[in-house]
């Protein structure tokens, strides 16, 4: 088994279809083998399990209240609504399980536990993967830290052309299937912040894949980029490029290449023009 360090980040706004992409990647074969996710973390799954207890045994780490509270205090994620004292009293760590008292906001506690687990896995040099809305810059910081620590960082990003699509999906699909609701205003504001974080994420990732899922049930992989040092190799399926990606074609690249030129060449190839 390969000991190479890998971090896999599945990112995209609420309701974009990250679960669909994760399922597809799990089923994929690379050189005849399944993709190695390492330890997989999903804050939503942590939140659902907190009442009875979230299983920590897959992590094979020495975790506990002291380390968790030290992380929480330095994280900047505690405030007047979720204090260090509340966490000390309400988050209960066992040998292989962590649970939370009902009085604590389970989604916020789950996010904090997830962040703690990322940090511990990174420090332990373990392979891991996680799912994120990607609206907060701390995920970019995590990717940078992983890259500096010798990880190959893989980014799997999916979005839609309009946050209204995401709002409707969360309402119609996730809630009806037992998923948690997210306020409309949050979905829209997160969509914008997530999209703003994409260019930097692409500059950090060793290998990135981008899907458009504007039409539900037909996610299209339209772009793949792989980096070697400061040089990037882009594979753009020009005929599939969605409207939401067009502004990124104008973002300057570290190696001096212009994505707009790469896009034009890809479009010419698609149409069979000689100078492509």
Kindly give the residue locations of the regions a language model identified.
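Short hydrophobic/aromatic beta-strand immediately N-terminal to the Walker A/P-loop
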Residues: 7-9
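Small-molecule kinase domains that catalyze NTP-dependent phosphoryl transfer to phosphate-bearing small molecules
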Residues: 181-225
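The conserved Walker
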Residues: 13-14
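Walker A/P-loop
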Residues: 19
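A glycine- and Lys/Arg-enriched "phosphate-lid" helix/loop adjacent to the NTP-binding pocket
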Residues: 148-197
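Conserved substrate/cofactor phosphate-moiety recognition/catalytic segment
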Residues: 26-123
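C-terminal accessory extensions appended to soluble enzyme cores
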Residues: 210, 215-276
């Amino acid at each position: 088994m390969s000991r190479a360090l890998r971090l896999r980040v599945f990112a995209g706004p609420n309701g974009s279809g990250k679960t669909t992409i994760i399922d597809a990647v799990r089923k994929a074969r690379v050189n005849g083998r399944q993709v190695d996710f390492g330890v997989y973390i999903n804050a939503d799954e942590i939140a659902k399990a907190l009442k009875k207890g979230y299983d920590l045994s897959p992590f094979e780490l020495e975790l506990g209240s002291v380390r968790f509270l030290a992380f929480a205090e330095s994280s900047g994620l505690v405030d007047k609504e979720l204090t260090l004292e509340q966490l000390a009293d309400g988050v209960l760590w066992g040998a292989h399980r962590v649970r939370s008292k009902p009085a604590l906001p389970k989604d916020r506690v789950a996010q904090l536990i997830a962040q703690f687990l990322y940090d511990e896995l990174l420090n332990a040099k373990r392979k891991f993967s996680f799912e994120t809305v990607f609206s907060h810059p701390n995920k970019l910081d995590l990717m940078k830290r992983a890259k500096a620590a010798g990880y190959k960082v893989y980014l799997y990003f999916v979005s839609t052309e309009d946050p209204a699509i995401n709002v409707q999906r969360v309402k119609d699909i996730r809630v009806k299937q037992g998923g948690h609701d997210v306020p409309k205003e949050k979905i829209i504001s997160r969509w914008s912040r997530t999209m703003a974080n994409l260019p930097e994420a692409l500059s950090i990732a060793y290998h990135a894949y981008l899907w458009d899922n504007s039409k539900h049930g037909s996610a299209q992989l339209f772009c793949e980029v792989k980096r070697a040092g400061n040089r990037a190799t882009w594979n753009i399926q020009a005929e599939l490029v969605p409207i939401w990606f067009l502004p990124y074609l104008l973002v300057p690249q570290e190696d001096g290449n212009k994505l707009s030129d790469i896009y034009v060449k890809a479009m010419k190839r698609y149409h069979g023009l000689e100078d492509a």
